[in-house]
Amino acid sequence: FAFAVWQVRAEVDGTRELATLHEALLDSRSWFGDHDERLAHEYAAHFGMPSDRLLAYWRSLRYELDDRMQQGALHYYALAASLDEAAPLGALPWANVAGV
């Protein structure tokens, strides 16, 4: 199940701004991985749970759209298309962030 996906309009595909955003998201994910224990201790009370439970939850999250998640997204689009809520989609379109 893909809970959230960063999406952009087609006209920003391949732009320097998109590449910059992509790099910032990767840097943020890396920074969080280096500081997750401290953050769990700092914010456990805010979330009303022990820090080890919060840390375990955070570490259970995945940030890559693997094949299974991509198939789930396509299934979601197919269901939406069957209700005339979205156009049929045969494949997930990917933005060009490396070719800038």
Tell where the protein language model's regions lie, with residue ranges.
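Generic secondary-structure boundary/loop-capping signal
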Residues: 3-5, 62, 91
